[in-house]
Design a protein with these regions (language model features):
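Short turn/helix-capping motifs enriched in Asx and small/polar residues
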Residues: 1-30, 186, 192-201
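Active-site-proximal beta-strand/loop segments in catalytic clefts of secreted hydrolases
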Residues: 77, 84-85, 98-100, 110-115, ...
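Structural detector for hydrophobic anchor residues on beta-strands
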Residues: 71-73, 77, 107-110, 168
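Active-site region of chymotrypsin-like
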Residues: 63, 93-120, 147
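Short, solvent-exposed loop/turn segments that connect beta-strands within catalytic domains
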Residues: 89, 101-107, 159-165
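Acidic glycine-/aspartate-rich tracts in secreted/extracellular proteins
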Residues: 1-3, 17-18, 86-87, 157-160
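Surface-exposed, glycine-biased beta-strand/turn segments
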Residues: 28-93, 102, 127, 136, ...
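Conserved, short, structured surface segments that act as functional micro-motifs
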Residues: 95-97, 123-197
Length: 211
């Protein structure tokens, strides 16, 4: 993979603007070890109008990480579990964790399509703790091996709300950042690869998988 030195692990581009994230604040761990995006497709990132379904452009509320069934799912930051188990939605089995940032800002990490959970509501969890195993629950039950994934969201409020309302780009909290190679080409994100920005500041081009 092509490397790009001197890119801050706490900076990322999303439609051009570069944002700095305090390394002692929100940026913490990743929800899976050695994270990669499903099929390296930009349409599996967070964004408005980046998916073409049923003849319409659709939003995507989070990141889809490639995760074969039974992959360990990790808490991205210290927090308290506020939801765990079957969600009775397209998300299937899921976990929601509340995090307090800088003593005042509260956000929620959300992990979906799980096969099993290891935590209960009100459990205190630590960054990197195994909280669940990935799976194919909810509307992921018919996915093939290449498409098995963990759906991860960062939210400003708990609960499942349609669209991007209450959703935050996951790059705000994860260690490893992912951005589209060409974010301006909205209607073609399913045919565009990604750029992976590692914790050490190096970046790698990942061409999309057309299989």
């Amino acid at each position: 993979a092509e490397k790009y030195p001197s890119i801050s692990p706490y900076a990322y581009c999303n439609g051009n603007p570069v944002r700095y994230i305090d390394p002692d604040g929100m940026a913490c761990g990743d929800p899976v070890r050695n994270p990669e995006i499903r099929r390296n497709r930009a349409s599996n990132l967070y964004g408005e109008g980046i998916r073409y379904l049923d003849g319409q452009m659709r939003n995507h509320q989070g990141f889809d990480y490639y995760a074969p069934i039974e992959t360990d799912v990790l808490a991205v930051q210290n927090g308290v579990v506020v939801q765990s188990g079957e969600s009775n939605t397209a998300y299937g089995i899921s976990v929601t964790i509340e995090h307090t940032i800088d003593d005042t800002n509260i956000v929620y990490s959300f992990y979906a399509h799980l096969s099993e959970v290891n935590v209960n509501v009100n459990n205190v969890v630590s960054e990197g703790q195994i909280i669940a195993k990935s799976g194919m629950s909810g509307n992921a039950e018919t996915t093939n091996i290449e498409d098995q994934h963990l759906h991860f969201e960062l939210r400003s409020q708990p609960g499942n709300i349609r669209g991007l309302s209450g959703k935050i780009n996951p790059n705000e909290i994860v260690d490893t950042k992912f951005i589209s190679q060409f974010p301006e080409l909205k209607s073609f994100q399913s045919q565009i690869g990604i750029i992976k920005i590692n914790k050490d500041g190096t970046a790698e081009i990942r061409d999309y998988n057309a299989r």
